[in-house]
Amino acid sequence: DVLRLCLWTKTRGIRLIVDESFVDFSCGMPDNTLLKDGILEEYPHLAVVKSISKSYGVPGLRLGILASADRELAAWIKKDVSIWNINSIAEFYMQIFGKYEQSYVRACNRFMKERDRFMQELSRVPFLNVFPSQANYFMCEVKPPMKARSLTGLLLKNHSICLLYTSPSPPD
């Protein structure tokens, strides 16, 4: 589907930016990334961004990449977008990161199995409509008669789970 979108945007002269920050958690990993020379060269209007710190669970390191075959875009980014310096801890992390790649792949595979199990369990809750996910989170619709605001209160009171309620609808 994403490659079809790449083709569609290419034929219309539209730049496409794809965020792959959570792609490591999706089925088909690691082969389902767009971060491949052949794909980037075939679709020079494509820019792929990925937060390494999100995927690998090291948010304090603030590591990420942007890849594109569009040299003008790369030159513009180098010129006009401030680049953060990488501190010594992040630099060391990048040096040892390959050593643990197979362990990371195994952990992602375990995560995918657990995600499937967890979705089945969530789907058993009568007032939730759980949408399938390839990420490390689920989107759920709270169905009547339960109200989202009431659910957040129950989860906090009964299970010490704190959720942020952000609906613009009036409170129940």
Where are these regions (language model features)?
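PLP-dependent aminotransferase class I/II
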Residues: 45-124, 128-131
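Short amphipathic alpha-helical segments and helix-helix/interface helices
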Residues: 2-7, 35-40, 74, 98, ...
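Residue-level detector of structured alpha->beta connecting loops
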Residues: 13, 44, 126-127, 160
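Conserved PLP-binding catalytic core of the aspartate aminotransferase-like
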Residues: 111-112, 116, 122-158
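Active-site pre-lysine segment of PLP-dependent enzymes
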Residues: 1-16, 22-55
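Hydrophobic residues at beta-strand termini and immediately following loops
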Residues: 49, 163-164
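Conserved small/polar residues in nucleotide/adenosyl-binding loops
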Residues: 165-172
